[in-house]
């Protein structure tokens, strides 16, 4: 056991985690040069296309160190995006140490900080690594000072390497073996294995990634899931050397995969503890905090025949992604679907794309909303995650919206722009600290504003230099209203949105204008209105298509023309009574972009 090292690689987006993993795998000979490819751990097509890591991946490698000993390295490559931070905390729970990778050109960014604090809270040994020293813009001295100043860990002798060229990666491994402590645990004690992650394989059923904390797990053992008490047979187990390799047992301190022929998706939840049926452990290991979704949106299959497949797909995906929340929902405009909860907009986009790709579904998404706390006049408190569930205005005593605490790190040059943006988003500044030429800003901003497009706009006002980390702080009373959209005097539930009273006029007007562009013209006039309660705040009309009935009139008898026009008018009126308006998918997505173009 003293030769096992478990560690994660944590860093801000694009600081080179996945490339460093590639080099480590290459040096330790996990894959032959022929099998090696760039970002070998980003196995999902989506990850490669966007160049981001979404799922944490684990690998077990053997490394022969300079002291002649052979060490087992179990390492986990983690995502860097704020939306996937729960993946990072799950990976860290399985480790004793973490490599904090910092780009020697960019310096410390907000996610670097957030992930590093997560690691420190879990009492992990953090080893700083300065990456990308081959860049002409690299300034390792300055960045080492930044790490000490902002993060507060000693970085004077931080390892310098370039994952791209492979310089210094050997030193990283030596430092790892020296500084990160071996796992603790009792190899003879009763088995306790933490489920770090699981996913669904069509042939094997549920595959779980486990970290053995105490005891040993052997092939063929009867394993008990502690939360449900169900017993399964450990059919196969092994390790990843990126490839799945079968083993006969997993020893204390190791990280490996396990297949128990579990067909039920909820059979082995992530964060649960496995133990032996015949010699069970006294208590379960502390799991992970359940992450609360911040953004909710309705997902509906385009054709209602896909509903069953859609339900199964969501089940399989939620196994792989513990933070996805979903419950059935029906809408008059869109039929049956699910209300899903996500950690942020990127998460929502990724999930939608994974559903469409991996399970071949066509989906319609409604506008994302956050959760509001409503105190009714009967003094009940309810939580509302969709505009259609909001009680009538006269039953609401107080409506409270979620406030997020946002930590931003940015160069001083962009401070003015960013402050203007935060104020426009109804933010309140709570803190501001200067570190060298970087500024750390803390703002409290309503979650609804952060979730919509704050991140994109922050990046664009600061030319990509500002970075953001946010978390839910509290609910706060504020003047929010529901804007309904009426098409030909019928409310369309899927188009309603909740917004601040100050913006409601402009939001309503903009939404109506957007709709006017997107709804195709029909044989009759379509009235589009935005309303708060019964008060109409904006209206526009999609003009009808009409045939020129006077074209065949030759000469000028006015009564003949009037008769024809009158007849046409009556026809249109009848049509309007029975006509339905088809809404294209773009119309639902228009709400997402309301408030973006006007800036």
Curated annotation (Swiss-Prot):
List of residues binding GTP: 14-19, 131-134
Topological type in the membrane: Peripheral membrane protein
Role this protein plays: Required for accurate and efficient protein synthesis under certain stress conditions. May act as a fidelity factor of the translation reaction, by catalyzing a one-codon backward translocation of tRNAs on improperly translocated ribosomes. Back-translocation proceeds from a post-translocation (POST) complex to a pre-translocation (PRE) complex, thus giving elongation factor G a second chance to translocate the tRNAs correctly. Binds to ribosomes in a GTP-dependent manner.
Molecular function GO labels: GTP binding; GTPase activity; guanosine tetraphosphate binding; ribosome binding; translation elongation factor activity
Catalytic reaction annotation: GTP + H2O = GDP + phosphate + H(+)
Similarity comment text for this entry: Belongs to the TRAFAC class translation factor GTPase superfamily. Classic translation factor GTPase family. LepA subfamily.
EC number: 3.6.5.n1
Pfam families: EFG_C, GTP_EFTU, GTP_EFTU_D2, LepA_C
Protein name: Elongation factor 4
Gene Ontology CC entries for this record: plasma membrane
Domain tr-type G residues, every copy: 2-184
This protein's record includes keyword Ubl conjugation: no
InterPro entries named in the record: EF-4, EFG_III/V, EFG_V-like, EFTu-like_2, G_TR_CS, LepA_C_sf, LepA_CTD, LepA_IV
SUPFAM superfamilies found in the cross-reference section: EF-G C-terminal domain-like, P-loop containing nucleoside triphosphate hydrolases
Keywords: Cell inner membrane, Cell membrane, GTP-binding, Hydrolase, Membrane, Nucleotide-binding, Protein biosynthesis
Localization: Cell inner membrane
Record-level GO BP terms: positive regulation of translation
